Amino acid sequence: VKWSDSERAIITDIFSHMDYDDIGPKALSRCLIVYPWTQRHFSGFGNLYNAEAILGNANVAAHGIKVLHGLDRGVKNMDNIAATYAELSILHSEKLHVDPDNFKLLSDCITIVVAAKMGQAFTPETQAAVQKFLAVVVSALGKQYH
């Protein structure tokens, strides 16, 4: 993947200012609420029976934060994202049996939550960079499935 200087700057800036404790839980909660079939991978998280329960679930919040810290690894290794996520790809495919389409659903939710947080600062150029970055991560996480 080729990254322009502008894309690198946008991605680095967004993640350096991102409140992981806010964005992570909101993004994962949104994914579990909007796409309820994704909940099957989180059966050990306790009560996920409705939106209120999901939004208040400490395990969901903690995993959302963990996901964003995982994305931070990609930000720091933008030139080698596939290798950065090789072990996670194996874990999610061979042990957890996560449907790889779920990575795309979560990336869409991350984009929505970041856009809502940034407001008008989330320009089309910003969106393009964010979605490109997340698409590369999603592809890397799905490598083991192919």
Curated annotation (Swiss-Prot):
<keyword id="KW-0561">Oxygen transport</keyword>
<protein>
    <recommendedName>
        <fullName>Hemoglobin subunit beta</fullName>
    </recommendedName>
</protein>
<feature type="domain" description="Globin">
    <location>
        <begin position="2"/>
        <end position="146"/>
    </location>
</feature>
<dbReference type="GO" id="GO:0005344">
    <property type="term" value="F:oxygen carrier activity"/>
</dbReference>
<feature type="binding site" description="proximal binding residue">
    <location>
        <position position="92"/>
    </location>
    <ligand>
        <name>heme b</name>
    </ligand>
</feature>
<dbReference type="GO" id="GO:0046872">
    <property type="term" value="F:metal ion binding"/>
</dbReference>
<dbReference type="InterPro" id="IPR002337">
    <property type="entry name" value="Hemoglobin_b"/>
</dbReference>
<dbReference type="GO" id="GO:0042744">
    <property type="term" value="P:hydrogen peroxide catabolic process"/>
</dbReference>
<dbReference type="InterPro" id="IPR050056">
    <property type="entry name" value="Hemoglobin_oxygen_transport"/>
</dbReference>
<comment type="subunit">
    <text>Hb1 is a tetramer of two alpha-2 chains and two beta chains, while Hb2 is a tetramer of two alpha-2 chains and two beta chains.</text>
</comment>
<feature type="binding site" description="distal binding residue">
    <location>
        <position position="63"/>
    </location>
    <ligand>
        <name>heme b</name>
    </ligand>
</feature>
<dbReference type="InterPro" id="IPR000971">
    <property type="entry name" value="Globin"/>
</dbReference>
<dbReference type="GO" id="GO:0019825">
    <property type="term" value="F:oxygen binding"/>
</dbReference>
<keyword id="KW-0349">Heme</keyword>
<dbReference type="GO" id="GO:0020037">
    <property type="term" value="F:heme binding"/>
</dbReference>
<dbReference type="GO" id="GO:0031838">
    <property type="term" value="C:haptoglobin-hemoglobin complex"/>
</dbReference>
<dbReference type="GO" id="GO:0005833">
    <property type="term" value="C:hemoglobin complex"/>
</dbReference>
<dbReference type="GO" id="GO:0072562">
    <property type="term" value="C:blood microparticle"/>
</dbReference>
<dbReference type="GO" id="GO:0004601">
    <property type="term" value="F:peroxidase activity"/>
</dbReference>
<dbReference type="GO" id="GO:0031720">
    <property type="term" value="F:haptoglobin binding"/>
</dbReference>
<comment type="similarity">
    <text>Belongs to the globin family.</text>
</comment>
<dbReference type="InterPro" id="IPR009050">
    <property type="entry name" value="Globin-like_sf"/>
</dbReference>
<keyword id="KW-0479">Metal-binding</keyword>
<dbReference type="GO" id="GO:0043177">
    <property type="term" value="F:organic acid binding"/>
</dbReference>
<comment type="function">
    <text>Involved in oxygen transport from gills to the various peripheral tissues.</text>
</comment>
<keyword id="KW-0408">Iron</keyword>
<dbReference type="InterPro" id="IPR012292">
    <property type="entry name" value="Globin/Proto"/>
</dbReference>
<keyword id="KW-0813">Transport</keyword>
<dbReference type="Pfam" id="PF00042">
    <property type="entry name" value="Globin"/>
</dbReference>
